[in-house]
Amino acid sequence: MARENAFYITTPIYYPSGKLHIGNAYTTIACDVMARYKRMRGFDVFYLTGSDEHGQKIEQKAKEMNISPKAYVDDMAEGMKKLWNTLEISNDKFIRTTEEQHKKVVADIFERFLEQGDIYLDEYEGWYSVPDETFYTETQLEDVERDDDGNVIGGKSPDSGHPVELIKEESYFFRMSKYADRLLKFYEDNPEFIQPESRKNEMINNFIKPGLEDLAVSRTTFSWGVQVPSNPKHVVYVWIDALTNYITALGYGSEDTSLYDKFWPADVHMVGKEIVRFHTIYWPIMLMALDLPLPKKVFAHGWLLMKDGKMSKSKGNVVYPEMLVERYGLDALRYYLMREVAFGSDGVFTPEDFISRVNYDLANDLGNLLNRTVAMINKYFDGKVPEFKGEVTSFDGELQTTANNAVKEYEKHMEGMQFSDALKQVWILISRANKYIDETEPWIVAKDEGRRNELASVMVHLAESLHAAALMLQPFLTHAPKKIAEQLGLGEEYGLDWGTIGFGNFPENTTVVKKGTPIFPRLDLDEEAAYIRDQMANGANAASSEDETGDWDPNETDLVSEKEKQIKYDVFDKVELKVAEVKDCSKVEGADKLLKFRLDAGDNGDRQILSGIAEYYSEPEQLIGKKVVIVANLKPRKMRGEISQGMILSAEYDGKLQIVEAPSEAPNGSSIS
């Protein structure tokens, strides 16, 4: 059982099927905030994140790229780690489900379930979505396709909209129904287990009370996964493989179980609302079958949406965190994500809201308070923070009360993972301190030598307020609190020690900096909002320090067409023409007539088109940056071993071909009619 001062928090492990966006960062930053808060309060924290690296989708992607699944996930895992480093995530471990120790324990657990009779062998038939790794019944499908007799012959996943396929295969099943009553009793005895409360009602009413169906826990149609030792043609399916990462990462089932003994059960599994069922039904039941303690809490947060719904490259509304960090700094992103949305609810990202938060909260309220305070202490007290002498002015007591209440409410909200509310308390203090300056009018008091004590009290009260704000901001912002402490003349050891919070603790005669540098410069709202929208529209908001051409695979691009997709080449009456920007152009090795284009046509990623015009362009680089016209809905085909995802229009005259150019101001992906 975990020791009293231990705290274990986890993100879901991410599936490495594509570049992570701001929504993934939202979950991971939230966990990081909680981990940093608990460390600040003296807890011994273990923060886990990682990657879920098995499954049919990964096997297929690797095959398309002509590399091994292991090589594919190795590359994707490194990309994840790089992003977490950029966001300064303080995780203690990054687990990968391809680790040998994890695979061994997963196989052992599967065999134990089998021996206990919790798992049985049967046959399964159902509609399966590869990207979602989920089976669906006919009644769950969307956009159902039927034959002339009314039989279902296809459809789409209700979760993602991806096409499904009918699969019939032998599978092992877990007897979920065996544990349904025990799970309900656990919910009753542990009312805080599922947060927010609405998620618990959803699980009970939609899944448990109607009758828990037994769960398919193995597959035979792919091989990239953990083999079942007693029946090697079966691969352990995602539920047992992925969910057990939370205990295998701590050494469960290994020779060294010291971390498991200390930190399990988990204090918090942080998940998105779309996977709450797996963590609050499947995972607890598996732990019951293993006779292990259940997690203390599963917190299912909402989605970070755009005004036009979920993020989608096809809509041109995906935001990658690297771009925001590079242009505005990490603190701005972390603050916005935790402040803008009530944690647990859905929130909407807009460029205008993001820039406004930075300007009003960080630059105006916090930044100006720090700048004014440092400047006045330098001007009136030669840079020395005066001694705290309690309530001297008629406004001192109210500011102290505001600070004390803010700290108390902040602690309550942080414990409940209501991060937006916790930050509101910090800004209540900051706003009150700014008002305190206007009330006390230090520039007038300074003219009267007989009011020197009042002036000194104002200065130290402002310094104390900023110190308290910096301490409360530590879990959220990884740079600004240190800068505030430095400008106030406090060393990091004292200035960022939670035990020093409270008025009367500021060291007398501390020397502030001579001139503080603004920690959050003001931004031009219109200019910066336009910049972000441009990055979203053009799909160029990946980290600019990264070479885009390095690991791009056109097979991963989700081609977007408003007309019927993938028509055959002889059916041109349905042709769709689009504007595309040339991002790269080069000759195809071993093919004298072919040029290979990388194009931004407003798709879910860049597309690749091969065109037989090499003899007319001796320097293909000259085409980079041009806007061209493409046939967007041709079925992709292979040419000289390369995928070609459309056709570039060219005009023929005097026996030569020249690319048809679109207007330079036309947005990428716009239709031509």
UniProtKB/Swiss-Prot annotation:
Segments carrying motif 'KMSKS' region: 310-314
Pfam families (UniProt xref): Anticodon_3 (PF19303), tRNA-synt_1g (PF09334), tRNA_bind (PF01588)
Subcellular location: Cytoplasm
Annotated PROSITE patterns: AA_TRNA_LIGASE_I, TRBD
Signal peptide: none
Binding site for ATP: K313
Keyword Ligase assigned: yes
CDD domains tied to this protein: Anticodon_Ia_Met (cd07957), MetRS_core (cd00814), tRNA_bind_EcMetRS_like (cd02800)
The tRNA-binding domain, residue ranges: 571-673
Keywords: Aminoacyl-tRNA synthetase, ATP-binding, Cytoplasm, Ligase, Nucleotide-binding, Protein biosynthesis, RNA-binding, tRNA-binding
Assembly notes: Homodimer.
Similarity annotation: Belongs to the class-I aminoacyl-tRNA synthetase family. MetG type 2B subfamily.
HAMAP family: Met_tRNA_synth_type2
Name of this chain's protein: Methionine--tRNA ligase
Organism of origin: Oceanobacillus iheyensis (strain DSM 14371 / CIP 107618 / JCM 11309 / KCTC 3954 / HTE831)
Organism phylogeny: Bacteria, Bacillati, Bacillota, Bacilli, Bacillales
Primary gene name: metG
